[in-house]
Amino acid sequence: MNYTSYILAFQLCVILCSSGYYCQAMFFKEIENLKEYFNASNPDVADGGPLFLDILKNWREESDKTIIQSQIVSFYLKLFENFKDNQIIQRSMDTIKEDMLFKFFNSSTSKRSDFLKLIQIPVNDMQVQRKAINELIKVMNDLSPRSNLTKRKRSQNLFRGRRASK
């Protein structure tokens, strides 16, 4: 590589790092705007302990933590939905919402759209309730651990192997 290539590569690194820093700084600025609007720095906010942080500390396994995080993300989306008509904090909420969804779904748009579709389902709608009850067995089966199926397949393969060797 010649000097020009090194200089261009260095400039690209500087640009990417500074834009990442800028995005991060903008993100923190938007959170500070929300803290100011909701008066979240007031000492009485600490009454009763943290809302989510203790719960997050209790869960170590990635799959378990993801379940808890999905509920927390859902909470924030509902919170932002309640204030969607507030022009003072709209930009801050939109910025944080986009960043939160991007991070939570690892930039997967299909997972994101499915998640958003799920949290928009109206629980009080009779037709929705009927459909949900109709699908309950399949959902419960999907929630069941796969270990029994894996053990059964393993024992079947082991049995077949013994029979073939005789």
UniProtKB/Swiss-Prot annotation:
SUPFAM superfamilies: 4-helical cytokines. InterPro entries: 4_helix_cytokine-like_core, Interferon_gamma. GO terms for biological process: adaptive immune response; defense response to virus; humoral immune response; positive regulation of autophagy. Pfam families: IFN-gamma. The keyword Secreted applies. Keywords: Antiviral defense, Cytokine, Glycoprotein, Growth regulation, Pyrrolidone carboxylic acid, Secreted, Signal. One of its GO terms (molecular function) is cytokine activity. It is found in: Secreted. The modification Pyrrolidone carboxylic acid is found at residue 24. Released primarily from activated T lymphocytes. One of its GO terms (cellular component) is extracellular space. Residues 1-23 form the signal peptide. The keyword Glycoprotein applies. Homodimer. Interacts with IFNGR1 (via extracellular domain); this interaction promotes IFNGR1 dimerization. Belongs to the type II (or gamma) interferon family. Type II interferon produced by immune cells such as T-cells and NK cells that plays crucial roles in antimicrobial, antiviral, and antitumor responses by activating effector immune cells and enhancing antigen presentation. Primarily signals through the JAK-STAT pathway after interaction with its receptor IFNGR1 to affect gene regulation. Upon IFNG binding, IFNGR1 intracellular domain opens out to allow association of downstream signaling components JAK2, JAK1 and STAT1, leading to STAT1 activation, nuclear translocation and transcription of IFNG-regulated genes. This is Interferon gamma. It comes from Ailuropoda melanoleuca (Giant panda).
